[in-house]
A protein has these predicted regions:
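N-terminal secretory signal peptides that target proteins for export/translocation
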Residues: 1-15
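Compositionally biased, intrinsically disordered low-complexity segments enriched
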Residues: 6-9, 24, 34, 280, ...
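Charged (often Lys/Glu-rich) extended helix/loop segments that serve as interaction or gating elements
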Residues: 33-178
Length: 803
């Protein structure tokens, strides 16, 4: 039997499913921000004897017809190419389009894997209007597999007293939606009415969100955009939290979709014990290949009592990232970071690494690469805080003058760079030419404190010139199994200003201190180096072990001789901006030995162990007069060997640098970096990290030790640890702890403890955090509730979660 226009009924049924699932998506927030659209791949089980498209097959225990009116009784079914409609009784008038189904009505859309049940259906295929009574159904979920989103394979389920269609609008009355298992769902969103306009929006009115029957919150209006790129202005869900130093926190926000290319999110938080915090996020994508994101955060701090003094730590921070494809091979990218004070960062930062980070760096560049050349235009600002702001006292009146930043500030406004990679000069001659060049306008400022007294300020001109050119020639030879790579180069650098000793400040600080003088200075250096790459020694072990079917041990010896001359004791006259200014005389030989162990299992080969050793022999222990006795010396040659400074006087050899890495089994890895100084006869610094994960269990630990001359750096002895059980989508209990303990200060600087319980459709997380460093001593308590496939609301941010 051929029945036309049955697709109209399918449209109503499909929209009911969309209404329930899309209204459900409105739970996390009233405002809709742009999100990535992930395609849903559904593999439907094959069906046999499927009717061709446009044709319908009917079956029933009793079939009757009067003209174009069809009546089906007893196990009545109407099946099409993609859908199945079943009921106890079905009546369809092909002339008027009226369709009535009663008794155990069932509908299945095989294409979308959606199912619907109802007691009774009245529908007109001509006017595309109809009603469903005592309806419930389910549809496959849209799984949004983003970080921080709890997911589930449970279908979305809904119930309603009745549902209707009016033109393009679909309405479900007196119902609820959930994606939990029935009949005892963990959560429901229940309301008297749900509206949907396909392709535009879905709305829930006067709805109540319940968890295990307990009302969690009520809202008179929930909105969810149904557009492919949802953008709708609106208010964000309020949140609440608590901190031992900030008091109770109440937060609210608004999302403004300016147009399809720009949006702004504004959030305000009221800390009852401290003041108001403001957070503004501006995003833009004005054209293809160009986008940016800028976040401004500020706090108006009423202050906190410390002793008998009210201390205020208000301020602001700005962070922004952006990039743009300018076409024709040109590309621009930038990162902006700014804080008004280091005190503000320590007090109000929500990340431990951010709160203790002393560097604030901004850089923007425009780049083009072609052939073997690279061209950059760079603008940069680096602010390196030496400590929190210092309350300065007038040395004469002894009156407090205010807070001064104790930070080194370096700017490049701008610097133009042109580099050329190695390029063979003649085809049959092993000779390659390369060069580095740069010209920029630079600036450096550094305050000089003695206690709480500002002695002087080291400061260059606002636009100091520096021009740098370094051409190099390289060759390569092979002799008796040894690869020989000689290299010769020149280094010419012009400075429009230089530095000279500052006797007054040096006497006050009892340290060598410099001041800027307006004397032009040219640095002319020449360098020669030769790499000797010796043949590797290798042995294969065929015995099968727990690491693999075969093992291979490789030894890689190498030596590098380097000679740089022409700088001498002029080294101290150059103002420091970056590693270009750290070049000094040297006459040295670096020896290195690397052991590697490879394991082969089947066709897969991986490195399971490596141990690298370096040490440098200095034939010029004073580096041409650049070294200053009794103070910390940082030269380019020593900085390239190890990040830890070790020069406080002349010496003939460097510490022995060791890096050991192990990854013997899949889920276990370890690394140990250490410097052993034969001159002191001990390990001067050591960094160890170990990571292991088995099933749902994980553990990570690290130890950092600095035990060297106090002139070089402040001693350190810290333990980092993280351990726990669980993962973001693990059902049941999850728990973990993360912390940093300072043995030197005997204090737990940072700790996070999180407990999460996930059900089949939602999860509750509780987290306690402690900060104890610098000017901050604070405990925080945070809670978050997650709904699977939808999102999370609460005060626990996804970037602060352990899992």
């Amino acid at each position: 039997m051929s029945i036309q226009d049955c697709h109209v009924f399918c449209s109503l049924r499909s929209c009911i499913f969309r209404l329930t699932s899309l209204v459900l998506l409105a739970v996390p927030a009233l405002a809709q921000t742009p999100s990535a659209l992930l395609p849903n791949l559904r593999i439907n089980p094959p069906r046999s004897n499927v009717p061709p498209p446009g044709e319908w097959r009917t079956t029933a225990l009793v079939e009757e017809s009067e003209g174009r009116v069809y009546r089906l009784h007893g196990k009545a079914q109407v099946e099409g190419a993609a859908v199945l409609f079943a009921a106890d009784d079905i009546e369809f008038n092909e002339d008027t389009g009226d369709l009535r189904a009663t008794g155990n009505v069932y509908f299945h859309d095989f294409g979308k894997n959606e199912q619907l049940w109802a007691d009774r259906v009245e529908y007109n295929t001509e006017s595309e209007t109809g009603k469903f009574y005592k309806v419930h159904g389910e549809t496959s979920p849209r799984i949004d597999a983003r970080p921080g989103i709890l997911t589930t394979n449970n279908p979305f389920y809904f119930e309603g007293d009745w549902a209707e269609r009016e033109g393009e609008k679909y309405i479900v009355h007196n119902g609820f939606v959930t994606n939990c298992k029935i009949p005892s769902p963990w959560w429901t969103l229940r309301g008297p009415r749900f509206d949907i306009v396909p392709g535009e929006h879905a709305v829930a009115y006067r709805s109540i969100f319940r968890v295990k029957g307990l009302p969690l919150f009520f809202t008179p209006f929930f909105y969810k955009s149904l557009e492919k790129e949802p953008r709708k202005s609106g208010f964000l869900i309020p949140n609440i939290g608590h901190s031992s130093r900030r008091g109770i926190m109440f937060g609210a926000g608004y999302f403004w979709a300016i147009n399809r290319s720009y949006d702004v999110t504004y959030q305000v938080q009221d800390f009852t014990a401290r003041g108001l915090a403001h957070h503004a996020d501006l995003r833009g994508k004005p054209r293809s290949g160009t986008d940016y994101d800028a976040i401004l955060y500020g706090v108006h701090d009423r202050g906190i009592e410390q002793g008998k003094t009210l201390q205020k730590y208000g301020g602001l921070s700005l962070s922004a990232v952006g990039k743009s494809d300018l076409g024709d091979g040109w590309f621009a990218r930038g990162t902006v970071n700014y804080i008004s004070s280091f005190r503000f960062r320590q007090q109000w930062s929500e990340s431990f690494n951010d709160a203790i980070g002393s560097e604030v760096q901004s850089v923007g560049f425009m780049n083009k690469n072609w052939s073997s050349y690279t061209f950059n235009v760079v603008a940069a600002r680096l602010q390196n805080f030496q400590s929190s702001e210092i309350q300065v006292t007038d040395p004469i009146t002894q009156q407090v003058k205010g807070l001064e930043a104790n930070a080194v500030t370096i700017r490049k406004l701008p610097e133009v760079q042109l580099d050329g990679r190695e390029r063979q000069i003649w085809k049959n001659v092993p000779l390659w030419f390369s060069f580095d060049s740069a010209a920029g306008l630079l600036y450096r400022q550094e305050p000089l404190f003695s206690g709480d007294t500002l002695i002087d300020t080291f400061q260059t001109g606002r636009l100091m010139d520096r021009i740098h050119l370094a051409p190099h020639l390289m060759s390569a030879f092979h002799f008796a199994g040894v690869n020989i790579v000689p290299r010769f180069g020149l280094d010419e650098t012009y400075y429009s200003e230089s530095q000279a000793p500052n006797p007054d400040a040096s006497q006050a600080l009892q340290l060598p201190v410099y001041r800027v003088i307006g004397t032009d200075l040219v640095r002319s250096a020449h360098d020669f180096s030769m790499d000797l790459i010796f043949p590797t020694l290798a042995r294969v072990f065929d015995n099968k072990t727990i690491f693999g079917d075969k093992l291979k041990h490789v030894i890689e010896p190498r030596a590098t001789y380097r000679n740089i001359a022409g700088i001498g004791d002029d080294f101290m006259r150059f103002v420091r901006f970056d590693d270009t200014d750290l070049l000094s005389n040297t006459d040295e030989l670096e020896l290195s030995l690397t052991n590697r162990l490879y394991a082969k299992r089947g066709d897969t080969v991986r490195e399971i162990f490596s141990w690298q050793l370096w040490q440098t022999r200095y034939f010029d222990p004073t580096f041409g007069g650049a070294l200053v006795q009794g103070q910390r010396n940082v030269l380019l040659t020593t900085a390239e060997l190890t990040p830890y400074a070790f020069l406080v006087g002349p010496r003939n050899y460097s510490p022995l640098v060791s890096v050991l890495r192990m990854s013997p089994v899949g889920q276990w890895s370890a690394e140990w970096r250490a410097d052993y100084d034969p001159l002191l006869g001990r390990m001067v610094d050591s960094t160890v990290s170990v990571d292991y994960r088995w099933s749902k269990y994980f553990i990570s630990a690290g130890h950092n030790l600095v035990h060297t001359d106090p002139i070089l750096t402040t001693p350190a002895n810290q333990l980092r640890f993280r351990l726990g059980f669980g993962e973001p989508n693990h059902r049941g209990w999850n728990a973990g702890i993360d912390g940093v303990y300072d043995y030197h200060q005997q204090v737990l600087q940072y700790a996070t403890t999180q407990v999460t319980y996930n059900t089949d459709c939602c999860g509750l997380s509780v987290q306690w955090r402690r900060f104890s460093f610098g000017t901050r001593n604070e405990n925080q308590f945070r809670v978050a509730f997650a709904v699977s496939n939808i999102g999370t609301f609460g005060t626990l941010r996804k970037q602060d979660r352990l899992f």
